[in-house]
Amino acid sequence: MAGMRRLELAEALHLGPGWRHACHAMLYAPDPGLLFGRIPLRYAVLMQMRFDGRLGFPGGFVDLRDGSLEDGLNRELGEELGEAAAAFRVERADYRSSHAGSRPRVVAHFYTKLLTLEQLTAVEMGAPRARDHGLEVLGLVRVPLYTLRDRVGGLPAFLENTFIGNAREQLLEAVQNLGLLEPGSFAHLKISTPP
């Protein structure tokens, strides 16, 4: 991922006191819905519009002295998503990757959490009442995991937005590795695919 090097979690946790840790989670759920009665949605994936106008995943900086990365991430999710985040807990088993950047010295830890569609919808409904809504978080968005007939609308157009850090690459890697897209979808996207 551009400007960042991938590292194992154990290595990331031993980098020392000069490093800050940020944890973010992609929340997703199977979605049997059809757009316009014919385009399968397959999955609902949440991202958020941040205070800086960029798209990213819920989460933020955590302090390892307060417990685990997951404790800090779940605290952040509660602040950004509200009470519905208490219905689930991101665990170590949900961990996907860590990437380190040298300036600033930040390690970005990424998690994916499978929810039910009801849980995900509750998060969407409750988010406007969350502590950080309207401040750090300007709103939640669902990622369109389809490509329209023109091969521009849907995911290709969504990926033209501005993302924070490596959130775009995290999204692409996760949806590919978790099998959230129709088989062969990446071949039709005019983007560079994750390694």
UniProtKB/Swiss-Prot annotation:
Its EC number is 3.6.1.62, 3.6.1.64. Gene3D superfamilies: Nucleoside Triphosphate Pyrophosphohydrolase. GO terms for cellular component: cytoplasm; nucleolus; nucleoplasm; nucleus. It is an enzyme of class 3 (hydrolase). One of its GO terms (biological process) is mRNA catabolic process. It is found in: Nucleus; Nucleus, Nucleolus; Nucleus, Nucleoplasm; Cytoplasm. Substrate binds at residues 24, 50, 57, 166, 170. Signal peptide: none annotated. Mn(2+) 3 binds at residues 76, 80. Mn(2+) 1 binds at residues 59, 80. Transmembrane segments: none annotated. Keywords: Cytoplasm, Hydrolase, Magnesium, Manganese, Metal-binding, Nucleotide metabolism, Nucleotide-binding, Nucleus, RNA-binding. InterPro entries: NUDIX_hydrolase-like_dom_sf (IPR015797), NUDIX_hydrolase_dom (IPR000086), NudT16 (IPR054754). Pfam families: Nudt16-like (PF22327). Residues 18-168 form the Nudix hydrolase domain. Induction: By steroid hormones. Mn(2+) 4 binds at residues 99, 173. Its cofactor is Mg(2+); Mn(2+); Co(2+). Mn(2+) 2 binds at residue 76. RNA-binding and decapping enzyme that catalyzes the cleavage of the cap structure of snoRNAs and mRNAs in a metal-dependent manner. Part of the U8 snoRNP complex that is required for the accumulation of mature 5.8S and 28S rRNA. Has diphosphatase activity and removes m7G and/or m227G caps from U8 snoRNA and leaves a 5'monophosphate on the RNA. Also catalyzes the cleavage of the cap structure on mRNAs. Does not hydrolyze cap analog structures like 7-methylguanosine nucleoside triphosphate (m7GpppG). Also hydrolysis m7G- and m227G U3-capped RNAs but with less efficiencies. Belongs to the Nudix hydrolase family. NUDT16 subfamily. PANTHER family: NUDIX T16 FAMILY MEMBER, U8 SNORNA-DECAPPING ENZYME. Homodimer. This is U8 snoRNA-decapping enzyme. It comes from Ovis aries.
